[in-house]
């Protein structure tokens, strides 16, 4: 199989950006190394173009008649190989050369049919959807691998999603023409689609992992039997006698949570702690904001339902830790595709990649424009890639924050 054609552009007028995208796609499809007739497109636009989403989709689909299926969303930024368009107009498109019987585009109004066995799925979500975390879990259960990858739309306007199936507009969309908001949409893939996916966390633990010994909805009341607020102040070396300093530090602090497993009808602590021996978070850790303090019970409120038996560690965003972990997952992907103990002809080649990163990681977070994508290019190589900066990242059956999800398609 050949490389996936991809393109990206920015311009104040979407028509000119689309013109540049089409020129890039057509030039690549004319090259022997790239697929000449792919039928599935991924499209990501920045929120500067959100109000023009329908016109953009109509134009691109008319100019690319062989492409019968479209999926995508909007973000505060979009990405491509070696470049980011963050908080500015931007379009990124990739054309996937995958057999038609190995994928299905779906949405909330045109859900995945029973006739297709999904092995995994790329999922785009609207953050305003009620019970989103539960919907993601339910969607994961509908796949053979119980693994999803994707993200939650981000931007200043209402979330926009794209979904068109092979026979035109998806049933139920009516005049929407493949552009809508709310719920989940994406692409389900069959078992014959070869891919490797990894999650990278962007926060560094600044405390030991502790067990939640009392909780009330989203309030952590005690940690290891002590008032949670007292534990946090001690771990962060803070004093309420210096309230401004304490408030500033708490605002920049998050929590890494590992929910307890359900075993034998009773809640028990995870076999693993939130913090690995290497000092970083594993895939099972969910990073969430501290949203308030409870002086009466000396507890802390977090942006997640918590329960007794969960593991918790305080953490902070850390650029160096994020860079190192991003390089790590790229190295793991390359190792899986090019294991040292295989002959050269057994090496798999990357056809294309999708990267969903947190909007909090984009822009200046890595020190300079497009720095995150440049790290991926140096570590993974010069491969076709598109992506989006999301307000929540989807991996496995969960919603993550301050993370990145890198997925590569292989031959």
Where are these regions (language model features)?
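Contiguous, structured surface segment used for ligand recognition
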Residues: 56
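Small-residue-enriched flexible segments
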Residues: 1-50, 59-62, 67-353, 358-366, ...
């Amino acid at each position: 199989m050949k490389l996936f054609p991809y393109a990206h552009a920015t311009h104040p007028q979407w028509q000119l950006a689309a013109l540049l995208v089409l020129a890039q796609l057509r030039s690549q499809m004319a090259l022997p190394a790239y697929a000449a007739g792919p039928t599935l497109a991924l499209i990501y636009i920045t929120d500067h173009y959100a109000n023009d989403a329908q016109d953009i989709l109509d134009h691109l689909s008319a100019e690319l008649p062989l492409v019968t299926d479209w999926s995508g969303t909007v973000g505060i930024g979009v990405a491509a190989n070696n470049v980011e368009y963050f908080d500015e107009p931007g379009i990124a498109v990739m054309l996937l050369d995958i057999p038609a019987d190995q994928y299905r585009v779906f949405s909330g109004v045109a859900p995945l049919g029973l006739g297709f066995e999904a092995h995994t799925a790329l999922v785009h979500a609207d953050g305003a959807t009620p019970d989103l975390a539960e919907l993601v879990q339910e969607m994961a259960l509908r796949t053979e691998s119980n693994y999803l990858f994707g993200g939650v739309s981000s931007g200043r306007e209402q979330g926009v999603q794209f979904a068109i199936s092979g026979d035109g507009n998806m049933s139920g969309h009516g005049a929407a023409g493949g552009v809508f908001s709310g719920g989940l949409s994406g692409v389900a893939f069959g078992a014959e689609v070869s891919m490797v996916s990894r999650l990278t966390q962007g926060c560094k633990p600044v405390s030991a992992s502790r067990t939640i010994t009392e909780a009330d909805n989203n309030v952590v009341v005690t940690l290891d039997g002590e008032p949670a607020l007292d534990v946090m102040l001690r771990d962060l070396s803070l004093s309420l006698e210096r309230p401004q300093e304490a408030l500033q530090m708490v605002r920049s602090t998050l929590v890494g949570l590992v929910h307890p497993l359900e075993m034998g009808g009773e809640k028990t602590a995870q076999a693993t702690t939130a913090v690995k021996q290497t000092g970083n978070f594993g895939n099972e850790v969910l990073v969430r904001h501290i949203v308030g303090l409870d002086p009466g019970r000396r507890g802390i409120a977090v942006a997640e339902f918590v329960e007794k038996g969960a593991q918790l560690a305080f953490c902070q965003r850390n650029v160096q830790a994020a860079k190192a972990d991003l390089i790590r997952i790229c190295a793991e992907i390359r190792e899986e595709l090019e294991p040292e103990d295989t002959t050269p002809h057994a090496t798999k080649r990357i056809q294309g990649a999708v990267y969903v990163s947190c909007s909090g990681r984009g822009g200046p977070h890595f020190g300079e424009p497009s720095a995150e994508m440049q790290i991926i290019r140096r570590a993974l190589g010069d491969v076709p890639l598109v992506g989006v900066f999301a307000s929540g990242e989807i991996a496995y059956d969960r919603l993550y924050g301050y993370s990145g999800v890198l997925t590569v398609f292989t031959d």
